[in-house]
């Protein structure tokens, strides 16, 4: 998509921090209420991976992609843990690990793409370290 490079998109121009931890709690409470109203007993909530956030919000603050990715992962950890604490399965959407190959990294060698993907997975694993594996699933597209 050649037009994509000319779009003005939001980006990171300062330290990343959670501004409203209550928002994720409220979302989980709303989903629980909706499930109860319809007799559902199991549910999941989805959240973006740190890697995909880094693709859509350009870094203008951190000294490297790695530092930026780690800051995103730490901020997303709060949301991930809120979802798990509420009893839901957390579905992490990770297009950066699949679709990113032919879109964002099409000019990169396969080895470079794999190196980047390994970093994204490392950050994701760190961000989800307090969540039981049975409460996690990954969506690739």
Model-derived regions: residue spans:
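Domain-level signal for soluble alpha/beta catalytic cores
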Residues: 1-141
């Amino acid at each position: 998509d050649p037009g994509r490079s000319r779009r003005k998109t939001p980006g990171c121009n300062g330290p990343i921090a959670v501004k409203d931890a209550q928002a994720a709690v409220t979302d989980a409470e709303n989903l629980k209420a909706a499930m109860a109203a319809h007799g559902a007993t199991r549910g999941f909530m989805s959240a973006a991976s740190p890697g995909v956030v880094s693709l859509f919000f350009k870094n203008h603050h951190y000294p490297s992609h790695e530092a930026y990715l780690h800051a995103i992962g730490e901020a997303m950890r709060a949301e991930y843990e809120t979802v798990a604490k509420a009893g839901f399965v957390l579905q992490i959407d990770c297009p950066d690990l699949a679709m990113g190959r032919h879109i964002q990294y099409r000019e990169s060698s396969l080895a470079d793409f794999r190196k980047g993907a390994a970093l994204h997975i490392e950050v994701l694993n760190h961000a989800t370290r307090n969540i039981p594996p049975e409460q996690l699933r990954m969506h690739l597209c």
